[in-house]
From Swiss-Prot:
Organism whose genome encodes this protein: Periplaneta americana (American cockroach)
SUPFAM superfamilies linked: Tropomyosin (SSF57997)
Family: Belongs to the tropomyosin family.
Coiled-coil stretches: 1-266
This protein's name: Tropomyosin Per a 7.0103
Length: 284
């Protein structure tokens, strides 16, 4: 009988232990379910966050492609401006060559004037001799008239050449104005690109990268932004250089115009002197 009681007590104790283990297992199962639900929720949150990061990265890549396209357009515009500046330099060189040739013709006309003056002196001496002898030297007068006609013809040709130079200078001024307008347009595009780069930088800073692949892509984008910033600074420097070149060309055009006015005044003086000399010779 005692053995049965002991056995019953042992079975009861084993039952109580089994109940305790069952309760513990149930609690562990509930805890495991809670952890599983929490893990699933974290996984969904992480997946949603990763999808958002992918979308932001795709949007950033599209913005970077647009910035690259706009920078390429800016490079083409700057190259066109540089080509126009080179063309203006060539035109200035041609104008300088024309001016040199005009100066050579002016020197020739001046030499002719000196010869005419010398011939006039000789004619004066001959006139006095002829007055004393009562003879007229018609051949000398014809030669002087021919020289005066030739000098006048050269002066007229020089005037025509200077008119052509003035017309070319007007064309150069128009080209300079167009180059300045393109330089101003380039500066406004640079400001727009700076604003877009700032927006891209802010978007990149707001991204939370949780995976190694996302970290690597973020570093690549930062490097691209650094490269784009460097190219933007280079574009700004090239735009400033183009503006300085335009200003330099404008100063050169002003100098050529001043020389043109000066040379016309010299030609006018020579023509007046030739007319006066011819009048004096005819009066004799």
């Amino acid at each position: 009988m005692d053995a049965i009681k002991k056995k019953m007590q042992a079975m009861k104790l084993e039952k109580d232990n089994a109940m305790d283990r069952a309760l513990l297992c149930e609690q562990q199962a509930r805890d495991a379910n809670l952890r599983a639900e929490k893990a699933e929720e974290e996984a969904r949150s992480l997946q949603k966050k990763t999808q958002q990061i992918e979308n932001d990265l795709d949007q950033t890549m599209e913005q970077l492609m647009q910035v690259n396209a706009k920078l390429d357009e800016k490079d083409k515009a700057l190259q066109n401006a540089e080509s126009e500046v080179a063309a203006l330099n060539r035109r200035i060189q041609l104008l300088e060559e024309d001016l040199e040739r005009s100066e050579e013709r002016l020197a020739t006309a001046t030499a002719k004037l000196a010869e005419a003056s010398q011939a006039d002196d000789e004619s004066e001496r001959a006139r006095k001799i002829l007055e004393s002898k009562g003879l007229a030297d018609e051949e000398r007068m014809d030669a002087l008239e021919n020289q005066l006609k030739e000098a006048r013809f050269m002066a007229e040709e020089a005037d025509k050449k200077y008119d052509e130079v003035a017309r070319k200078l007007a064309m150069v001024e128009a080209d300079l104005e167009r180059a300045e307008e393109r330089a101003e347009s380039g500066e406004s595009k640079i400001v727009e690109l700076e604003e877009e780069l700032r927006v891209v930088g802010n978007n990149l800073k707001s991204l939370e990268v949780s995976e190694e692949k996302a970290n690597l892509r973020e570093e690549e984008y930062k490097q691209q932004i650094k490269t784009l910033t460097t190219r933007l600074k280079e574009a700004e420097a090239r735009a400033e250089f183009a503006e300085r070149s335009v200003q330099k060309l404008q100063k050169e055009v002003d100098r050529l115009e001043d020389e043109l006015v000066h040379e016309k005044e010299k030609y006018k003086f020579i023509c007046d002197d030739l007319d006066m000399t011819f009048t004096e010779l005819v009066g004799y």
